[in-house]
UniProtKB/Swiss-Prot annotation:
One of its GO terms (cellular component) is cytoplasm. One of its GO terms (biological process) is translational termination. It comes from Mycoplasma mobile (strain ATCC 43663 / 163K / NCTC 11711). The gene is frr. Responsible for the release of ribosomes from messenger RNA at the termination of protein biosynthesis. May increase the efficiency of translation by recycling ribosomes from one round of translation to another. This is Ribosome-recycling factor.
Length: 183
């Protein structure tokens, strides 16, 4: 098989791992309100799961607050229920027609806990990328159409991609850690 066949598949899967990691770390609050924290949170609306961002206007009126204004006021209770199920360090205030989320300022101890959580997510993202490499390497080694030289070339190319995507993970990690530790 052609090198592009292998590399395109690897790029796609590794990019997916980086994107998943990026989404996960976006949900780690650095003491500042970030609308990404509530992206993807669903609640039931007329027996259908709906995401908050589909059913409400979301804004950040202050550095440590998110304001959710549902398009249909009847959904306020459902939104609050779904937010309560999330394990975020925030105060949920029902203001009738809207919901205000208040985030406390982070203590040094809490920042360190979040960095530990970040390290775990970082490691699992790297493991996912290495797993893609390992699976692809097995396929390359099983490909009987490839000569030894071609196999070595393909394996080297897969390793270069692995290094590139692990570097991306590390860059995201550095940025997030810096954000968490900035007071």
């Amino acid at each position: 098989m052609e090198l592009n066949f292998y590399t395109n598949k690897v790029k796609l899967e590794m990019e997916k791992a980086v994107q998943t990691y990026s989404n996960q770390i976006a949900k780690i609050s650095a003491g500042k309100a970030n609308p990404k924290l509530i992206s993807g949170i669903k609640f039931i609306y007329y027996d259908e799961p709906m995401s908050i961002e589909e059913m409400a206007a979301i804004s950040v009126p202050e550095a440590q607050q998110i304001l959710i204004k549902p398009y249909d006021i009847k959904t306020t209770k459902n939104i609050i229920e779904s937010l309560n199920k999330m394990n975020y360090d925030m105060q949920i205030v029902d203001e009738g027609a809207q919901v205000r989320l208040k985030f406390p300022a982070l203590t040094t101890e809490r920042r360190k806990e979040l960095v530990k959580q970040l390290v775990k997510l970082n490691e699992s993202a790297k493991v996912a990328i290495r797993q893609v490499r390992q699976d692809e390497n097995k396929l390359i080694k099983k490909d009987e159409e490839l000569s030894e030289d071609e196999q070595k070339k393909y394996l080297d190319e897969i390793q270069k991609l692995t290094d590139k995507y692990i570097f991306k993970i590390e860059e995201l990690n550095k940025d997030k850690e810096k954000e968490l530790m900035t007071i």
